[in-house]
Amino acid sequence: MNEYVIAYSYKGQRRYEHIFARTPDEAKDLFRGRHIERIESCVLAKYSPN
């Protein structure tokens, strides 16, 4: 399983920017000090149509 977090940062005018990261600390580093509205955990899986 590929466990990640999704971090959301408000960009203004009801728009959010989101990133996938392996840990909340990595998400904070990727946003370079910008305020993070929320962090959610998720599991990414490969999709196979067969």
Predicted regions and their residues:
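Residues marking helix boundaries in flexible regions
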Residues: 7, 20, 37-40
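A subset of signal/propeptide-processing and intrinsically disordered low-complexity segments
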Residues: 11-13, 30, 35
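A short, exposed loop/beta-hairpin motif centered on an aromatic-Gly-Thr core
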Residues: 13-22
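Short aromatic-glycine-(Arg/Gly/Cys) micro-motifs in beta-strand/loop hairpins
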Residues: 1-14
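Short, surface-exposed linear segments at secondary-structure transitions and domain or protein termini
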Residues: 24-30
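Short, mixed-charge low-complexity intrinsically disordered segments
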Residues: 32-50
